[in-house]
């Protein structure tokens, strides 16, 4: 297994269809872990079996934690791989739901300079949230585990999720993007004054 043993959140998971169906013990590392501060390494062969295993580990961890995205450094693996999916229940704007997307060696290009500040949280900062400015529209591209290429132009929450996950590959956590740290705090405390959370 590619999941490393650290003292953070243990997740016991099985990912039928992406793996051999066996149980993997995996965890999501938290802010302060060195894997989250490093620039991740490019993947040389996206079709290699170890990348398929990594993706399976990531998918299981993301779904077990009920997240919408995960980057390989969040399970302490220094590879430029991100996954995300936004089901209809999590869509916050007129954009459609996003099916499971796997991007290896992703590249982002903003479309214009327009930015929007919105609420973000992260599986590596459990219980926390903050207001983060992000580009409103962008192009992204990346390679799939089958060796294909994904190219999309997206906006809204989809664009926010991609930017958040790709930041992890460069050692950036969302508080580092915030302009006003007074909007950063524990979700349960913020809910008392911001009911829309």
Located regions from the model:
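Positively charged
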Residues: 6-197
């Amino acid at each position: 297994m590619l999941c490393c043993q650290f003292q953070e959140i243990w997740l016991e998971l099985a990912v039928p269809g992406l793996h051999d169906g066996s149980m993997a013990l995996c965890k999501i590392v938290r802010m302060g872990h060195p894997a989250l501060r490093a620039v991740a390494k490019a993947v040389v062969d996206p079709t290699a079996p170890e990348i398929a295993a990594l993706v399976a580990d990531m998918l299981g961890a993301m779904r077990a934690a009920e997240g919408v995205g995960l980057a390989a450094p969040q399970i302490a693996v220094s590879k430029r791989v991100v996954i995300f999916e936004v089901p209809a229940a999590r869509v916050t704007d007129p954009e459609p739901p996003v099916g499971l997307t796997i991007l290896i060696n992703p590249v982002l290009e903003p479309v214009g300079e327009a930015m929007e500040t919105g609420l973000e949280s992260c599986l590596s900062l459990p219980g926390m949230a903050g207001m983060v400015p992000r580009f409103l529209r962008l192009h992204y591209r990346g390679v799939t585990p089958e060796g294909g290429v994904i190219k999309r132009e997206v906006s809204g929450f989809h664009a926010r999720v991609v930017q958040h996950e790709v930041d992890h590959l460069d050692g950036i956590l969302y508080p580092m993007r915030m302009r006003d740290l007074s909007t950063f705090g524990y979700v349960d405390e913020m809910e008392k004054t911001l009911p829309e959370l």
